[in-house]
Structure formats: C-alpha cells, structure tokens
C-alpha cells in the first residue's frame, strides 16, 4: 500500500516489499491510496513497465475498491507499507465495521504515526485480510531477505532477458553485453524499478 502525497511515496520500499513477495511465491499488488489528494502518475509510471498489478484508489468516487475486493476474494491478503500510507483507511473503506484507528501525518517528520500495533485478520469478500503494523524503513540485509543470487528473479519484468547476457553470472549493473541494461536503454524497463534493483543488490 502506497500514498501519492503524504508521506512521500518511496518506490524503493514498495519494490523491496514486492521483491520479497515474489521471492516467497506471493503475488504482490501495488495499491495507491490517497489518490484523491494528488495525481498518482508518478507511481503509475514507475510500474507501467513492470508486471505488477497497480490499483489507484479514489475514496470520493470509490474507484479501485471493487478491484481490491476481487484480489481479496479466495485469498489471504496482507496490507503492508510505511506508517501513514493509508492501510487502515483502506480497510475502513472496504469494511466500515472494522473501525480501524487512523492518524494524521506528522508535519515535523513527514511520515505517519503507528496506529496499528499488531496483525489483525478480517474475514471479508470470500477471503481474509491481514492488517499489519506500519514501519519507517525496510532494510534488505536483515535475515530472511532475498539471497543475492535470487534477486534478479524477484523482478519479474527482467525475466525475458535473463540468460541472454554476454557473461554468466551477470549482475546487470556494470557488465558489458548485459541484456537487462540493454532493455533498460531501449525503454523496455522502468528506470525507477532498475534503480531499486541496484540499491537492493548493494544491500544484500
């Protein structure tokens, strides 16, 4: 779950969460909340060249909520993201009886305050929703993160180019003859997503 305005969206955090999900065999879906506060084109453009589903929520019109419900149906879904991005607000919009506590963004820190302090599971729409506590940062070098040799596979849009590089074991960062970097240069891949890959590669 991501915000388009407050707190400022971090594509690196989103990409870390998405990569962890892919590595563990979980389908990530990017849900952009607070879409009624500003245009979501920044986030949309970052993911339009990826294979990740992207949903923009407009609480004024209700746009996007039905699509979220469809993803929940028949599944166990976890709402994850930074504090203040609107996870509890999204849950309240989907399940008014949930009455999850929400809070304003800290003007001093520019980020959300923790209002959800434990994981709570709700039965809804033929599936289950796990509302998880927010966080301020997500470090890629913690135990259980993606092994460096698996990281390229955690970016599904890299898939068509893997195994096509000039050198075996290509890291897709500085090597000549890299098919991933060539696809990036040709505009087939998102620069933002590629930058996240490089940042994560340096962390793990």
PLM feature spans:
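N-terminal accessory targeting/assembly segments
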Residues: 1-11
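Helix-rich effector regions associated with P-loop NTPase G domains
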Residues: 3, 19-28, 35, 50-53, ...
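Catalytic P-loop NTPase motifs of RecA-like helicase/translocase cores
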Residues: 8, 38-39, 63, 136-139
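Short, well-ordered secondary-structure micro-motifs
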Residues: 10-11, 41-42, 67, 92, ...
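Charged helix-capping and loop-helix junction motifs
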Residues: 13-16
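Canonical P-loop GTPase G-domain recognition
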Residues: 34-85
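Conserved ATP-binding TGD loop and adjacent catalytic N/P-domain core of P-type ATPases
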Residues: 79, 92-96, 102
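Walker A/P-loop
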Residues: 83, 88-89, 93
């Amino acid at each position: 779950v991501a915000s388009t305005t407050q707190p400022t969206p971090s594509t690196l955090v989103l990409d870390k969460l998405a990569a962890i999900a892919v590595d563990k065999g979980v389908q990530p879906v990017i849900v952009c909340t607070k879409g009624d506060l500003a245009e979501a084109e920044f986030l949309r453009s970052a993911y339009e060249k990826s294979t990740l589903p992207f949903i923009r929520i407009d609480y004024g019109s209700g746009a996007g909520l039905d699509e979220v419900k469809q993803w929940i149906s028949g599944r166990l879904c976890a709402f994850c993201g930074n504090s203040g991005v609107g996870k509890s607000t999204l849950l309240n919009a989907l399940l008014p009886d949930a009455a999850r506590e929400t809070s304003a963004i800290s003007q001093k820190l520019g980020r959300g305050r923790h209002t959800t302090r434990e994981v709570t599971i709700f039965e809804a729409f033929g599936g289950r929703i796990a509302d998880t506590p927010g966080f301020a940062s997500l470090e890629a070098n913690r135990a259980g993160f993606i092994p460096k040799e698996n990281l390229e596979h955690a970016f599904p849009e890299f898939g068509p180019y893997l195994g096509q590089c000039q050198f075996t074991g290509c890291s897709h960062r500085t090597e000549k003859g890299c098919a991933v970097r060539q696809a990036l240069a040709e505009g087939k891949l998102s620069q933002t997503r590629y930058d996240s890959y490089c940042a994560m590669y340096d962390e793990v």
